[in-house]
UniProtKB/Swiss-Prot annotation:
It is a single-pass membrane protein. Its EC number is 1.-.-.-. A motif (HXXHC 2) lies at residues 187-191. Keywords: Glycoprotein, Membrane, Oxidoreductase, Transmembrane, Transmembrane helix, Virulence. UstYa family oxidase; part of the gene cluster that mediates the biosynthesis of the phomopsins, a group of hexapeptide mycotoxins which infects lupins and causes lupinosis disease in livestock. Within the pathway, phomYb is probably involved in the construction of the macrocyclic structure of the phomopsins. The pathway starts with the processing of the precursor phomA by several endopeptidases including kexin proteases as well as the cluster-specific S41 family peptidase phomP1 and the oligopeptidase phomG to produce 10 identical copies of the hexapeptide Tyr-Val-Ile-Pro-Ile-Asp. This is UstYa family oxidase phomYb. It comes from Diaporthe leptostromiformis.
């Protein structure tokens, strides 16, 4: 033996295991660096995303508010238009409404006399409810209407109805007095059916409540409020556009 150790000298290059450890350390360091960079980026994008979300939320709320406002406006507009009376041509009588409570008036329902005759006659305007309509405005092409004429005549129906009611009243009292020759049967027969159709046409739906016993025998109709057309306004219109000066309810 020469006295030297038999161990081999260490190689100057690192072993495979030591290389693996170094690589893992470098990889971990790199991953930590990348992770920190991503955290930094996410930290920068966080407020930006939050601001964008808030902006989109505000836009959505604004759009919904606008839609709700438009819907409410259209609803109110449609309801208002529905409540407004239809636009009438200049030659048409006014259609205004008012509340009226029905009550018995003896001057109309009682026996004939000078006072009652005056009261009934005063229900009719001068011209007996006949009006003049100029052809300067559009007039519907009714049967028998000559559109070539410069003006037309028309009878406002309510005054025709009042005339018919008066004629049936006059016929009743004439017959009760035994003066049957004063009753124009054809005229009265016409008036009965004309008034029937007029009443059914307007069909007043006011409810007349049954009274408590012992008055639960029916209804007089007195004391109930009705929605009525403004008769005074129609009377004034017929007077302004009257076709004549005669003021009578009969004939």
């Amino acid at each position: 033996m020469d006295g030297y150790s038999s161990k081999k000298p260490r190689s100057a290059s690192p072993s495979r295991s030591s290389l693996t450890e170094v690589e893992e350390e470098e990889r971990d360091t790199l991953l930590k660096t990348v992770s920190l960079e991503e955290e930094d980026k996410s930290g920068e994008n966080g407020p930006r995303k939050l601001r964008r979300s808030r902006f989109l939320y505000a836009i959505g709320i604004l759009m919904l508010s606008n839609i709700a406002f438009i819907a409410a406006f259209l609803t109110v507009f449609v309801q208002k238009r529905a409540l407004e009376p239809a636009r009438l041509p200049p030659w048409a009588p006014p259609e205004r409404y008012e509340s009226r409570v029905f009550k018995y008036m003896d001057v109309y329902g009682g026996e004939p006399g000078p006072k009652s005759e005056e009261a009934w006659t005063n229900l009719i305007p001068k011209g007996k409810g006949w009006i003049k309509v100029h052809n300067e405005t559009a007039i519907p092409d009714m049967p028998g209407l000559d559109q070539s004429l410069p003006e037309q005549s028309a009878l406002v129906s309510v005054f025709h109805q009042l005339h018919c009611l008066y004629m049936t009243r006059a016929g009743y009292f004439a017959a009760r007095s035994g003066n049957l020759d004063e009753v124009n049967v054809v005229h009265v027969s016409h008036c009965w059916d004309y008034l029937r159709q007029a009443i059914m046409c307007h069909s007043d739906t006011t409810l007349e409540w049954l009274h408590a016993p012992p008055d639960n025998f029916g209804s007089t109709g007195w004391g109930y409020e009705h929605q009525c057309r403004d008769y005074e306004a129609i009377f004034a219109f017929a007077t302004e556009h009257r076709a004549g000066e005669r003021q009578v309810i009969h004939g």
